A protein has these predicted regions:
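PLP-dependent amino-acid enzyme catalytic core
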Residues: 1-141
Length: 142
């Protein structure tokens, strides 16, 4: 790639990408300045969660950061339990945006310090949540 003048930017395990994703944390705190007890963040490779958590914990350490993973792609949960990054043998693909076999090196370093809890959800729970969001706000935009 370099010989062609191209630069590879890792989709989640890059400090600049993580910092950029932290701006979502800034938006959350701006829009909900006093009403927040916890933020639930989907985790694949961990960049989004690491960015949001780093920003939020710096300004509002009392806010709980809850990482949410599909139970068939729970690479952060496995890494935290093992206290090291773990490569899953297989990952489910229903939640394809978070279907990652191994949490990033930099994201794991951050998340093991910043995340208050990791929860896993089943495909059925993901489907139910999609339906709930559609019923709550989706119909207004159809």
């Amino acid at each position: 790639m370099a010989e062609q003048g191209l630069t590879y930017i890792h989709p989640f395990d890059d400090p600049d990408v993580i910092a950029g994703q932290g701006t979502i944390g800034m938006e959350i705190l701006r829009q909900l300045p006093e009403q927040l007890d916890a933020i639930f963040i989907a985790v694949g490779g961990g960049g989004l969660c690491a960015g949001i958590a780093a920003y939020v914990k710096q300004l509002r350490p009392e806010i709980k950061i809850i990482a949410v993973e599909s139970d068939d792609a729970a690479c952060l949960d496995a890494a935290i339990k093992a206290d090291r990054r773990v490569r899953l043998k297989q990952v489910g693909i229903f939640a394809d945006g978070t279907a990652v076999a191994q949490i990033g090196k930099e994201t794991f370093r951050l998340l093991k310090e910043l995340v208050d809890e990791v929860i896993t959800v089943s495909t059925d729970e993901i489907c139910a949540a999609i339906k709930d969001v559609y019923n709550e706000i989706g119909r207004a935009h159809v």
